[in-house]
Amino acid sequence: MINTSPLLNYVSSHHDIKAINQWRTDVEKQLQDSYENGQSIREIIKARSDLVDEALVFLWKHAELDQSKLGLFAVGGYGRREMLPYSDVDIMILSEDEISEENEKRISTFISSLWDVGNFKPGISVRTIQSCVEQAATDLTVATTLIEARLITGNTQLAKWPRRIVSQTWTDKTFYDAKMAEQAKRYHQHNNTESNLEPDIKNAPGGIRDINQIGWIAKRHFRVNRIYDLVHLGFISEFELAVLEEAESFLWEIRHHLHRLAKRDENRLLFDHQREIAAKFGYVRQEGQPVNYGVEQFMKRYYRTAQQVSTLNEMLLAYFSESVITPRLPNYERKIEVVNDHFKIVDNKLAVQHHKIFAEHPSAILELFYILANRPDIEGIRARTLRLLILAAKRINQSYRDNPEHQALFMSIIRSPYRLYDTLVAMKRYGVLGNYIPAFGQIMGLMQYDLFHIYTVDAHTLLLLRNLNRFREPEFAKEFPVVSSVFQRLARQDIVFIAALFHDIAKGRGGDHSELGAEDAIEFGRAHGFTERECKLIAWLIQNHLLMSLTAQKKDISDPDVVKDFAEKLGDMEHLDYLYTLTVADINATNPKLWNTWRASLMRQLYTHARDVIRTGLGRPVDYQMLIEDTKFAASELLVNNFALADVEKVWQELGDEYFIKESADEIAWHTQAILKHGDNPEPLVLLRAHRKAAQDAVQIFIYTRDQPNLFATTVAVLDRMNLDVQDAKIITASTAFSLDTYVVLDRFGTLLTDPEREETVKNALVKALSQPDQYPGLMQRRIPRQLRHFDIENTVDVTLNEALQQNMVEISTLDHPGLLARVGGLFMMQGLDIHSARIATLGERAEDIFFVTKKDGKPLNHEEVKLFSEKLKAALDEASNQICQH
């Protein structure tokens, strides 16, 4: 029992309707105290609804409506007695006939008093029975509210009408079809997934609306008031009801906290609130745990809960369709195809032959999915079979996993060429995959608290497997031409599938997830028929699944030594081919924004160069002189018809060997032609063209200008202002004191090379700024994205010496923000450092950038200079991060 102050104590002493405002404030505090003292959220939200009833009855009488024949109904969540702190108070005033003028005045008084109270958010409709019929017939929302309309006060004869109206205007089938179409639209608005980074706990798949949906459809047909009543009708089991109620209470509690934190009706579990709400549920990081452990465990519970809700929603509504809707269709004839002794296909869905199949033949659990994987014509699983399957999955134990028949069935599913992804998603959803591979069960719902990994670990893993499967489908060969060709010639494609399944399986355990996952995979591989050699290859792929992407992202892959070092770590073409396919599939399954033709070109370039090194022999040293001569010859062939070789040589002799080692013949010819045409023009030269290997996304910007301080900082500031994201930069300073800079940028709008006016704007902005870089304002003030303010990223600076280049490599990891590159470039200038090249990577909210620098005399920093510079750069990054968090 929750003790709250009686309303009459307030209105009788104050003689003022507005006193209800103070009463609501006081009882809301009392409700919160009760909640904090252990009262269940169910009791709290019901008590709040009853208190609102009390206030409305008082106001109804105050407006003298108790003397009318009208009825006051609660609708929506209020009708279900589900009131959160800032929920709308949705009501309907219903009349049997046309409303008299006198009652209209009373209604007006009642509505005015509702607004006068001040802390109600009323949603009011006034209808006659006839208008209800007319609106319900054409408006699904109206029909839905009528199903749960609850008479608060007034004419009790009207209480039966709302549901009667729905029965008159909608059949079981039309209402079911309309609500399912509405749900599909709602799902689409939330990416058809339970695991969005900032989920809407009311409307997203697996949210409160999914539970409401079960109630609406069942109440419409069975004429019950509570989902609990459906147990006695055999529509839902006691166990399923308990799962739903526990999930509903958890979602209500989250929503309760969201309302109080946001001080409004808020359903989105934003980054702004996740950590604080996690703490309210007791998910707090303990000493020695990762910094985001608490919030990640809380979100894991949320995602698992949402998965349970959406699965029950799917099963129960399918059961309703199969048992109530379909059999009543005119001319309906059940179509049955016998598959074998265990299964049949009923109306295109798979069903067991009898309800004891899984108990008597445990292998049928996996056999069901084997059939699904190899029969694209089957549309799903019958609801009764699904109910049996979910219960049977809980009986999968070590003895089941050790059974050779079951192991063979599982591998047959993995090797299925048809519906691997859909089958594995179903196995996960219905509890089979997490029980068959317990380590996979541990990562289900596990999220990483950042903007880079937009999927939970389990969802990411299955998307990776989907991508691998696509590499053998002709329709994706155009999108992934090289990797598709490589994948199709792999001797054992199931090796890379198992590596994919286990590559992140040890996340969340602590320790090196790659090493732990490799150990799990070896144990699994031995049990499932792989040889020791194959197990070692699977383990190597898991241990090195980030090697290729990190090499392409953080190292200069135009440097032959970098490629040679990478190739030596692989050893042979087999390891290269397997790793390449795994890497491309992995990147595409991490974040859709991460993959573009620029990144694809980097992967392809690294693959082809490593392949060439392996084929010519890993032991052979790089012949730089021959490489330079070959590149010059190829470039001169492209120029010979338009320019005198003497003029070409004059340009080239100022550039140094590194330029000809790292640039392609095509790019050298492009640069040389532009410089010769530019002649003695004192203005900076700026050219744009599509990147030769990544034309769809990436643009190359070539700048030729007199070398002077602040060039890099000025250039990147202009590019940021023009909505261009720098991916790569190469800066060559010629002996003539001219700088040749090549930037690869991604266009946020995708119009740079198709809109001549915009292209000209970018060129002019660069020319103007580079003509007087010391006067350019530099940093641009742009709005900091809301999400960035909630990530606590430790800024790191690592400065090392590249012995071969005699340059310092500066690696920074920091919170990405507008103007970051310009800020860093400005600091380099102030410290008297020249930037020779840069690799820029934005991974969600994190920037991981690499710069190769020297002092003005071309020499690297010494030990003391490195220490001093590192401290200054770290301080600058810390200051920028603090400004973002306080923004």
Curated annotation (Swiss-Prot):
Domain annotation HD: ranges: 457-579
Gene3D superfamilies: Hypothetical protein af1432, Nucleotidyltransferases domain 2
Catalytic activity of the protein: [protein-PII]-L-tyrosine + UTP = [protein-PII]-uridylyl-L-tyrosine + diphosphate; [protein-PII]-uridylyl-L-tyrosine + H2O = [protein-PII]-L-tyrosine + UMP + H(+)
InterPro entries reported in the protein's UniProt record: ACT-like_dom_sf (IPR045865), ACT_dom (IPR002912), HD/PDEase_dom (IPR003607), HD_domain (IPR006674), NT_sf (IPR043519), PII_UdlTrfase/GS_AdlTrfase (IPR013546), Polymerase_NTP_transf_dom (IPR002934), UTase/UR (IPR010043)
Region (Uridylyltransferase): 1-337
Domain ACT: 700-782, 809-887
Family: Belongs to the GlnD family.
Role description: Modifies, by uridylylation and deuridylylation, the PII regulatory proteins (GlnB and homologs), in response to the nitrogen status of the cell that GlnD senses through the glutamine level. Under low glutamine levels, catalyzes the conversion of the PII proteins and UTP to PII-UMP and PPi, while under higher glutamine levels, GlnD hydrolyzes PII-UMP to PII and UMP (deuridylylation). Thus, controls uridylylation state and activity of the PII proteins, and plays an important role in the regulation of nitrogen assimilation and metabolism.
Domain notes: Has four distinct domains: an N-terminal nucleotidyltransferase (NT) domain responsible for UTase activity, a central HD domain that encodes UR activity, and two C-terminal ACT domains that seem to have a role in glutamine sensing.
Protein name per UniProt: Bifunctional uridylyltransferase/uridylyl-removing enzyme
